[in-house]
Amino acid sequence: MVKMQVIFIAFIAVIACSMVYGDSLSPWNEGDTYYGCQRQTDEFCNKICKLHLASGGSCQQPAPFVKLCTCQGIDYDNSFFFGALEKQCPKLRG
């Protein structure tokens, strides 16, 4: 019974953390690849994320030898370069 309570509390904690911190996505550039930040700073990623209409961003390392820009408060459609560009420039919508 105690194991079940511990598992339940851990599950609730994970849900609460995801609600507080929200989802984050890595944006795609015009070549359909992620923005790498191996030699860049968090400020570079923050600017990239603002271009994708996100609230902010930073450089994260999701795997060994890989550093990607990760955006907070970004819509899935805006994670793609041309999707965000079309929202900013309505004349591009052909």
Swiss-Prot record:
Its cellular-component GO annotations read:
extracellular region
Query: What keywords tag this UniProt record?
Result: Cholesterol biosynthesis, Cholesterol metabolism, Disulfide bond, G-protein coupled receptor impairing toxin, Ion channel impairing toxin, Lipid biosynthesis, Lipid metabolism, Neurotoxin, Potassium channel impairing toxin, Secreted, Signal, Steroid biosynthesis, Steroid metabolism, Sterol biosynthesis, Sterol metabolism, Toxin, Voltage-gated potassium channel impairing toxin, Voltage-gated sodium channel impairing toxin
Where is it localised? Secreted
**Coiled coil, from the record:** none
Q: In which tissues is it expressed?
A: Expressed by the venom gland.
Q: Name one Pfam family in it.
A: Toxin_3
Signal peptide start-end: 1-22
Q: Name the domain of life.
A: Eukaryota
LCN-type CS-alpha/beta domain location is 23-90
Biological process annotations from GO = cholesterol biosynthetic process
SS bonds (residue pairs): C37-C59, C45-C69, C49-C71
Task of the protein: The homodimer inhibits HMG-CoA reductase (HMGCR) (32% of inhibition produced by 0.6 uM), a glycoprotein involved in the control of cholesterol biosynthesis. The inhibitory effects of bumarsin are seen at much lower concentrations (0.6 uM) than that for statins such as atorvastatin (5 mM) and simvastatin (10 uM). In addition to inhibition of HMG-CoA reductase, this protein lowers cholesterol levels by inducing steroid hormone synthesis via StAR, and by increasing reverse cholesterol transport mediated by the induction of ABCA1 and APOA1.
Domain characteristics, as noted in the entry: Has the structural arrangement of an alpha-helix connected to antiparallel beta-sheets by disulfide bonds (CS-alpha/beta).
Family, similarity comment? Belongs to the long (3 C-C) scorpion toxin superfamily.
Report what the protein is called: HMG-CoA reductase inhibitor bumarsin
